[in-house]
Amino acid sequence: MKFCAIFVLFIVLAINGYDCKIVQFIFGDSLSDVGNNKNLPRSLATANLPFYGIDFGNGLPNGRFTNGRTVSDIIGDKIGLPRPVAFLDPSMNEDVILENGVNYASGGGGILNETGGYFIQRFSLWKQIELFQGTQDVVVAKIGKKEADKFFQDARYVVALGSNDFINNYLMPVYSDSWKYNDQTFVDYLMETLESQLKVLHSLGARKLMVFGLGPMGCIPLQRALSLDGNCQNKASNLAKRFNKAATTMLLDLETKLPNASYRFGEAYDLVNDVITNPKKYGFDNSDSPCCSFYRIRPALTCIPASTLCKDRSKYVFWDEYHPTDKANELVANILIKRFDFMRADDGISHAPSPAPDISPSSDNN
């Protein structure tokens, strides 16, 4: 799971008459999506129907893949930051970017372009980076290159994805990656790709960046439902551990090589695993099945109006087959706030801007 420290104290800077804040730019998947896929007309990975959003605002679906808030929402709120707006939100413009930052996260997206292809439309990380480059062009036109460079270099960046590259790619025989690689070579492939992506983000100004690790993927309700005995699938969870270990090493290496880079890895595996293993310790009654399900039909994959809801959503760790409930997200957010020393605006680093490189091409339907 993926999320922490996308949050900073506000420092107001006078930029050509604008009050430019230090903001967040979030890159991720459905755990961080706040409405991008809602605006992708052909996407099969959406949270557009009830009962998604039932405990958020007016109770209507808003694009978040949960009943309430994401972890990013909760941490940002507690630190006092505005929520970054979804890139595809109709309200998006230059002023919104300068005031709130942007969330590019997309349900079904992965580090690899090929991940989640059967969802038809989703933003891979490469695509999200391309969109970010477009955001930069818009801001440069608004406030000028010098001030735009400072704005983007002062911003905070979060990269929180990777589980789809396993669950909706490598672990599915319909994808060629499942038979082209073994466990270690696939993780190596992911690390090579992610390293290239982080280097691109650095060249685009990302100096303060956090990558979040994966949780025990084999213990989400979907993976349990697909197992023979209803227990966690160790293969998937062990892949998450491999990913986390490799990402930690890669980030430490990158930080020493890239000028003025402050890169951190947010490890959450042990925390989430403990919540799932010992739910009552954290106030939950159920950690192995979704609150929103289609009667006894499992896996239901998504929550729909015909689904049935559990009696008390606050007692369930999982909202649907993939995603945590608002209550679980709140627990994780609170523990992460205590665990990590968040990157703040007042520890800024001065640096010279780097030229933007060519972006690796993304597939047409990303």
From Swiss-Prot:
GO terms for cellular component: extracellular region. The keyword Glycoprotein applies. SUPFAM superfamilies: SGNH hydrolase. Its main location: secreted. GO terms for molecular function: hydrolase activity, acting on ester bonds. The active site is at residues 30, 320, 323. It is an enzyme of class 3 (hydrolase). It is found in: Secreted. Residues 1-20 form the signal peptide. Glycans are attached at residues 113, 260. Belongs to the 'GDSL' lipolytic enzyme family. This is GDSL esterase/lipase At1g74460. It comes from Arabidopsis thaliana (Mouse-ear cress).
